[in-house]
């Protein structure tokens, strides 16, 4: 058989090739690619010849004058070790420090308009200098999350092991590649004017941090707001100019949950109920020092999404029935928003607030329909939701060269021992005696004095009549 046929070999399940009965002389292995459906994400070194020689004693040795190459080593036991490299990508979302979710850093909960911080950790392969493509793409549904492109920072280590910050346009380019459906950024390390910092990071990690803003259209169900990043890199090291470079892709995901609360407002007059529109409530949140962020330089103002919310004073909280003590002003409460019931037909009497983080909330009714009594105290609207995300974990590349490291398998919401699903809080107002509002307190006071005067007048009249009869 021809020489090419005899020595064309494929690695076994252990990554080994065995060639026997070689005669004295010089030989070389050249990688040409993967067998069909055997893609593993390792970069093919097909511009490297693994040269070796069989000497007079039948030993495997390095040929005289061979160029040193760190991609392979000739061992003393007649074997050769060849090194192939591949990068890695890990995506994490910064938690709100509430102890909720899984431990891996892939899920958390936030409020609409909150700034959500993400971290991408990239392992840089040792042969990155030989690659044509090395870039990161991060994609989000723009109705749920939107990148803050100016927040991107990239750091790593230089050749001396010192911390270094990568410079935009020099060490990488940053491009907004969003479309009508998605918010997307692309970080291309091969498009910068210098590769020095990238090459110095070979065999080490670089860290990318950036933020996104949770949008009003964020999903409030167990589907959550999933977003992903993928690292694209060349499959081989000898991509020529103009040659097609279909890269490998490593994908990783993270999810942000958010919740909602709502009201179904009913009016009751005897045995008759109807849905009430135009009823107003204020929603208050109990301050949680672990998860609610104070405005920098203040002790009484919370940053809630894009809002600045001041704590109620002890007197204000007590007047609303929020159980604050004047001495300590604990717990602290702040107003989140105002809800007004609206809707038509069967949807009348409804009001909802989307995009709330986990926490303790109360509703305080501030206005109701004419003829109905205001509630005498606040209504619990707590979102004490424990969520758990189960991930499908994978380490196999598909036949088209993609690795989906993590995908959401199932998500559960729990309220104590019970499954949690959203349901509006049904609140009932009852018909009551409705004094005219014109004149306010003065009218009520005058009415009371008038009654006393009439009664007193009757008493005087009766007294006078008795005296006359006498």
Place the predicted regions along the sequence by residue.
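Solvent-exposed loop/turn and edge beta-strand elements of beta-rich ligand-binding domains
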Residues: 1-470
């Amino acid at each position: 058989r021809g020489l090419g046929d005899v020595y064309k070999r494929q690695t076994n399940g252990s990554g080994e090739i065995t060639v026997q009965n070689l005669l004295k002389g010089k030989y070389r292995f050249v990688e040409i690619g993967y067998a069909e459906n055997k893609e593993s994400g390792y970069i093919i070194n097909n511009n490297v010849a693994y040269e070796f020689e069989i000497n007079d004693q039948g030993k495997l040795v390095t040929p005289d004058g061979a160029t040193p190459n760190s991609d392979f080593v000739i061992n003393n036991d007649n074997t050769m070790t060849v090194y192939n490299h591949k990068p890695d990508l890990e995506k994490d979302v910064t938690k709100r420090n509430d102890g909720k979710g899984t431990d891996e850093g892939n899920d958390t909960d936030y409020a609409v308009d909150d700034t959500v911080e993400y971290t991408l950790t990239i392992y840089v392969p040792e042969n990155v200098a030989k690659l044509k493509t090395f870039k990161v793409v991060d994609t989000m549904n723009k109705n749920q999350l939107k990148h803050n492109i100016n927040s991107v920072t990239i750091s790593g280590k230089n050749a001396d092991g010192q911390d270094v910050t990568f410079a935009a346009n020099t060490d990488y380019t940053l491009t907004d590649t969003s479309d009508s459906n998605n918010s997307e950024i692309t970080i291309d390390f091969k498009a910068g004017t210098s590769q020095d910092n990238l090459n110095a990071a070979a065999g080490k990690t670089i860290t990318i941090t950036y933020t996104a803003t949770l949008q009003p259209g964020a999903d409030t169900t167990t589907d959550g707001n999933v977003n992903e990043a993928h690292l694209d890199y060349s499959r081989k090291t000898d991509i020529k100019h103009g040659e097609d470079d279909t890269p490998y892709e490593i994908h990783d995901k993270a999810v942000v949950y958010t919740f909602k609360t709502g009201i179904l407002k009913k009016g009751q007059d005897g045995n008759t109920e109807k849905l009430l529109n135009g009823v107003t409530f204020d929603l208050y949140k109990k301050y949680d020092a672990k998860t609610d962020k104070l405005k920098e330089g203040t002790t009484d103002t919370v940053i809630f999404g894009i809002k600045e919310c001041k704590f109620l004073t002890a007197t204000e909280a007590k007047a609303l029935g929020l159980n604050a003590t004047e001495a300590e002003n604990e717990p602290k409460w702040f107003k989140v928003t105002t809800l007004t019931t609206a809707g038509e037909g069967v949807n009348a009497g409804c009001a909802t607030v989307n995009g709330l983080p986990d926490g303790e909330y109360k509703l305080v009714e501030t206005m109701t329909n004419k003829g109905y009594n205001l509630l005498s105290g606040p209504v619990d609207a707590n979102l004490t939701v424990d969520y758990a995300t189960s991930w499908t974990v994978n380490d196999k590349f598909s036949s088209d060269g993609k690795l989906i490291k993590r995908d959401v398998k199932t998500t559960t919401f729990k309220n104590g021992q019970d499954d949690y699903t959203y349901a509006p809080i049904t609140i009932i107002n009852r018909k009551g005696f409705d004094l005219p509002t014109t004149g306010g307190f003065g009218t009520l006071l005058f009415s009371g004095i008038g009654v006393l005067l009439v009664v007193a007048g009757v008493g005087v009249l009766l007294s006078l009549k008795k005296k006359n009869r006498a």
